[in-house]
Amino acid sequence: MFTKPKYPTYVLCLLCVLSVPGVGLGGPKDEKEVKEVKNESKDVGKEAERALSAANVLLEITKTPESGIPQDLLNHADAIAVIPNVVKAALGVGGRHGKGIVARRLPNSGWGAPAFIEVSGGSFGLQIGVSVTDVIFVFTNDDGLKGLLDDKVELGGDAGVAAGPVGRSAEAGTNVTFDSPIYSYSRSKGLFAGLALKGTVMTMDGSANRRLYGDKATGRDILFGSSLQAATETKPFVDALNRVAPKGTHEKKAMKTSKK
């Protein structure tokens, strides 16, 4: 005797399909997508942390004008980059590496959208040990940033770099002319000083920039474009720039860049 199924046939078929591993809701594909989203969110969190660390470094080194970056140099900076916690390791042959953030002054004297960068460089010598240093670069013109448009610039090679002047004595000097394209500073164990980092290579952190500004965002788009707004994660750094080098203290002409 034929017994009528308790559930319609299409319901039973659907249950069979959903019971197959990897098919339907909750399968491995969905788990993979969720994992990717979580990893991306974690990475974005790292960018936010990097921007906040850079902001803190910038604010801390300006607390003591007697031993910090001259205010006149900050006011006339075309761009400022901060790389917190640059690690330098040496064991016969050493090297340095760090991740930071850079922003460029706009024609209206405000600060544009920051881009994420990386620095690396080798050092040779019979040193053993590991040191952590905060590094700041002050760009006095757009020439120092041109290499970054091609995603790479070697300091001291592609762009001139010099140890930055320190304190009010440098600012008060009658013959002080900020004629180097880039001035570099370092802070290690609480000590702050100008430091020439020749041989250091600065590149765009493409993966970080794409996460925050979109898959097609380039260094040119972020630093020299007019349509991109600063990512929310970079707000602490922009706020710090507005505090140490506020709007209205600098006049600059818009730079025309050729697209490649």
What is the predicted function of each stretch?
Residues 27-260:
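Small-residue-enriched, tightly packed secondary-structure blocks
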